[in-house]
């Protein structure tokens, strides 16, 4: 049965929330800090960045000299990796205040757009916009990271992800539409190519591993492209599991740019349901374990005449593992919160500028924005709970850290950002 085309109108939205601009407790922060001998955060001759606005961050890392595009965190150690427009990746600690600088990774030919540790924590995989992939091996318990291997198979990499459960495994997509999957040798860090796929005719814009709960004998990936195709792959054989084209989506043009895997708690144990969003506002929900059956297809926004076409672009998608909720974030600043049991919009949040990333965590929805803020909402009520402020340019990425168990001290969650002005800020989430 064909899915019904649905247009979300303002009448269908139960509640619209416009976040407040001010934060209750604005704490000014001295960004210059003190030059501590063992801090290694800033050289005396470096010019400090002046942030002329309120700032409620705990601390900061500012060694990048250009935009910070990517941020990743080690699965076990308090270690952050950030990648920037300065063609560098930096390692630094997430538990100390201020952060302790732990090393710089060099050898990139362009901006570093992905920093990802492997699931077991033994390797760090980074990628840049010149098509380079560098693999660093952790030594001395993760205190040192040594270059183990590198490759350059494509002109430009768009995305790279490590597998969440299979050790030493990663995949990436390129601007020529190609898809690649590799496994890292545990002993020496050398690379074994598992597959390469050449089905997409335009940029392979995003990828997501699926069926990650099935053990190490199942290695499957779904990718999407600006050419309106969505493809699922068996990464061990390189075979296509299915391919969705414009014909399967009513002939609509859908330059896909975002992908998100639904948690099994929402899908009765099916770990192959994904949502895919396009840069013209089309949303598709697909069952990858049923030949790519389309469960839902809709246009999420009706643009006003004065709006730009890209205002409808779905930049980020996130599913709640606790409630029947899914959120999508648009370039126009709207966040639509869907009730996944009925595919109706339960809430609409309106931010001041483009949404860059969404993340559910327990009862909360976190959203980063080009206005330089990260918002914390109560996912069920839509109530704004906290706003991270301190950037004077956009937040391009962020991670959320949970307190380490059994430390004996009461700790709070932390938001760590990747800022367009070259700074990462560390925030403590008060509740």
UniProtKB/Swiss-Prot annotation:
Domain of life: Eukaryota
Lyase is among the record's keywords: no
WD repeat feature ranges: 63-102, 107-146, 149-192, 199-243, 309-348, 350-387
A GO term, aspect molecular function: unfolded protein binding
Keyword field: Repeat, WD repeat
InterPro entries in alphabetical order: WD40/YVTN_repeat-like_dom_sf, WD40_repeat_dom_sf, WD40_rpt, WD_repeat_multifunction
Biological processes per GO annotation: ribosomal large subunit assembly; ribosomal large subunit biogenesis
A GO CC term assigned to this protein in UniProt: cytosol
Subunit structure: Interacts strongly with QSR1. Part of an oligomeric protein complex that is loosely associated with ribosomes.
Known role: May be involved in the late step of 60S ribosomal subunit assembly or modification in the cytoplasm.
More info: Present with 19700 molecules/cell in log phase SD medium.
Protein name, UniProt field: Ribosome assembly protein SQT1
Taxonomic source organism: Saccharomyces cerevisiae (strain ATCC 204508 / S288c)
Gene it is expressed from: SQT1
């Amino acid at each position: 049965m064909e899915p019904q085309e649905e247009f979300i109108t303002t009448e269908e939205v139960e509640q619209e929330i416009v976040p407040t601009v001010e934060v209750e407790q604005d704490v000014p922060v001295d960004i210059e800090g003190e030059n501590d001998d063992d801090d290694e955060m800033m050289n005396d001759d470096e010019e400090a960045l002046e942030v002329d606005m309120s700032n409620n961050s705990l601390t900061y890392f500012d060694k990048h000299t250009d935009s910070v595009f990517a941020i990743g965190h080690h699965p076990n150690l308090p270690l952050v990796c950030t990648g920037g427009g300065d063609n560098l990746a930096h390692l630094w600690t997430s538990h100390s205040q201020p952060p302790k600088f732990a090393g710089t990774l060099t050898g990139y030919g362009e901006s570093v757009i992905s920093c990802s540790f492997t699931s077991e924590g033994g390797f760090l995989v980074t990628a840049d916009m010149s098509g380079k992939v560098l693999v660093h091996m952790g030594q001395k318990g993760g205190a040192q990271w040594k270059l183990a291997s590198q490759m350059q198979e494509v002109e430009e990499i768009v995305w790279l992800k490590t597998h969440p459960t299979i050790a030493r495994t990663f995949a990436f997509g390129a601007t020529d539409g190609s898809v690649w999957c590799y496994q890292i040798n545990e002993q020496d860090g050398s690379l074994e190519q598992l597959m390469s796929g050449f089905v997409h005719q335009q940029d392979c814009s995003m990828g997501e591993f699926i069926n990650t709960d099935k053990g190490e004998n199942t290695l499957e990936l779904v990718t999407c492209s600006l050419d309106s195709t969505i493809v699922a792959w068996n990464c061990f054989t390189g075979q296509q599991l299915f391919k969705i084209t414009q014909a399967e989506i009513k002939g609509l043009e859908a330059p896909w740019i975002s992908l998100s895997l639904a948690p099994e708690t929402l899908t009765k144990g099916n770990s192959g349901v994904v949502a895919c969003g396009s840069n013209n506002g089309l949303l598709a929900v697909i069952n990858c374990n049923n030949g790519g059956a389309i469960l839902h297809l809709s246009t999420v926004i009706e643009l006003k005449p004065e709006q730009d076409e890209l205002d409808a672009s779905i930049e980020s998608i996130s599913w709640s593992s606790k409630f029947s909720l899914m959120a999508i974030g648009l370039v126009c600043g709207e966040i639509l919160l869907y009730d996944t049991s009925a595919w109706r919009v339960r809430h609409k949040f309106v931010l001041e500028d483009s949404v860059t990333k969404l993340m559910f965590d327990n009862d909360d929805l976190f959203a980063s924005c080009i206005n330089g803020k990260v918002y914390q909402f109560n996912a069920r009520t839509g109530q704004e709970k906290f706003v991270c402020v301190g950037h004077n340019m956009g937040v391009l990425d962020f991670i959320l850290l949970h307190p380490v168990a059994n430390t004996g001290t009461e700790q709070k969650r932390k938001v760590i950002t990747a800022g367009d002005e070259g700074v990462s800020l560390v925030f403590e989430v008060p509740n």
